[in-house]
């Protein structure tokens, strides 16, 4: 513990040292109800063993106190790899290694395994946020790591980090906006004819395959449902020769601690569950997160992971559906490109200069890509 900028600074290895009331109280001041920054979600990641020292995520949360009041905080991890981040810096690590330098460990401010934009520098005001950034920089110097990375902050926070000397990087995701549609057909009516026809054909294929779908709200999800979803989730990772990041204990924990934010879509055929999609939502935003299947049916992924959640958004008046990382195919289903941000600080001056030049070139490519995507707007009004 030390006193800096009129705040007491604590660096803790467990979120419980900050406490749920203090953490969620500070989060509530950020102006958006982001479920992934909630104590319940982060605590579930840690306590389930999904994001912990053994998996390469060593928590090192920073908390700034004004007296007994939590004035600022951020989720920070010491990492020895770049898995589960969705802002790719593997090439940077390779370049360090080729020059005989160590890229790991590094500091990462992010929600593990979650490419969702939201507040990262939690603070009661802009002055406390500025102090938090200074403490973050001091922490990097004290721990002698190669770099610090803040992933998916809102643009306002990203610009403040840029003003503090961080390098800014941008990316693209695809989000759907609810224009107060009366129903799914009203949404379809706004799309180009070809897009509308393709979506109806995809939904028809699923129905003709004898598949039915049911939506289960968080409080109604049974242990059997969770076991089945986890089986689907793990099966899909195995099919891609990958190791799943999350486990059954994590899913059960969020189901118990934040049921009002959970929706599970289960696909069944001949009375047997064959696939499932898990989304997380607030009153105004839905986030597509996890999908898996144990039996393949053409177009079922689109039905369970996109069309069912879209219908849910329309029924519940949810304004935004964030589709997750990557995926131009989402545009054909009414999702539009949205810019995301990350901020990076590298200790090695020569590499910092080289990466700054790389990011300048990359930013030009992202601008061109956004222009190209916007020209392919799937809605009828854009086509004239």
Residue positions per predicted region:
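N-acyltransferase acceptor-side catalytic subdomain
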Residues: 1-384
């Amino acid at each position: 513990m030390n006193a800096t900028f009129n705040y007491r600074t604590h660096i803790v290895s467990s979120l419980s040292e900050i406490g749920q009331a203090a953490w969620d109280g500070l989060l509530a001041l950020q102006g958006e109800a982001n479920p992934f920054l909630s104590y319940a979600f982060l605590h579930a990641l840690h306590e389930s063993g999904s994001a912990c020292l053994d998996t390469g995520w060593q928590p090192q949360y920073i908390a700034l106190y004004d007296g007994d009041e939590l004035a600022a905080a951020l989720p920070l991890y010491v990492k020895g790899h770049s898995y589960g981040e969705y802002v790719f810096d593997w090439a940077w690590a390779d370049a360090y290694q080729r020059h005989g330098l160590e890229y790991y460990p590094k500091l990462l401010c992010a929600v593990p395994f979650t490419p969702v934009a939201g507040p990262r520098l939690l603070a009661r005001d802009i002055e406390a946020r500025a102090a938090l950034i200074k403490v973050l920089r001091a922490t990097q110097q004290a721990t002698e790591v190669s770099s610090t990375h803040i992933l998916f902050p809102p643009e306002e926070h990203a610009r403040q980090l840029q003003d503090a000397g961080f390098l800014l990087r941008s990316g693209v995701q695809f989000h759907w906006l609810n224009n107060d549609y009366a129903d799914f057909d009203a949404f379809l009516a706004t799309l180009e004819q070809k897009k509308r026809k393709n979506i109806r054909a995809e939904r028809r294929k699923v129905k003709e395959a004898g598949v039915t779908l049911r939506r289960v709200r968080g409080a109604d999800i049974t242990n059997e449902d969770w076991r089945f979803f986890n089986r689907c989730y793990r099966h899909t990772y195995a099919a891609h020769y990958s190791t799943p990041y999350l486990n059954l204990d994590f899913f059960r924990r969020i189901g118990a601690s934040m049921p009002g934010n959970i929706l599970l879509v289960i696909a069944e055929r001949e009375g047997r569950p064959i696939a499932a999609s898990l989304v997380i939502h607030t009153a105004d935003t839905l986030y597509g997160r996890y999908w898996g299947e144990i039996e393949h049916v053409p177009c079922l992924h689109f039905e369970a992971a996109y069309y069912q959640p879209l219908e849910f958004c329309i029924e519940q008046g949810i304004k935004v559906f964030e589709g997750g990382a990557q995926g131009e195919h989402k545009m054909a289903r009414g999702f539009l490109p949205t810019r995301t941000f990350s901020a990076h600080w590298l200790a090695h001056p020569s590499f910092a200069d080289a990466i700054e030049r790389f990011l300048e070139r990359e930013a030009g490519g992202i601008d061109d890509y956004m222009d190209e995507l916007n020209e392919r707007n799937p809605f009828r009004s854009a086509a004239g």
